[in-house]
């Protein structure tokens, strides 16, 4: 069975690039364009990994990560154009 990856990214070009690469490598993927949809897809898709943009509409990546961490330890890789140290520290602290 293929490993499942949730791509939570509102930039369609980035989402499609990640999707194309991961599918080529044999992963089963789903794309969520906003934080609300990301949580909805997460709960039904049960991914093995989440690629999560910090700056999402509806609910930001920090909030999505917090909701996931309330009940689960699925690995999350935070994606962002932000380069501030506080963003890196916050991501690491959230697990």
Predicted regions and their residues:
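N-terminal/domain-start alpha-helical segments
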Residues: 1-95
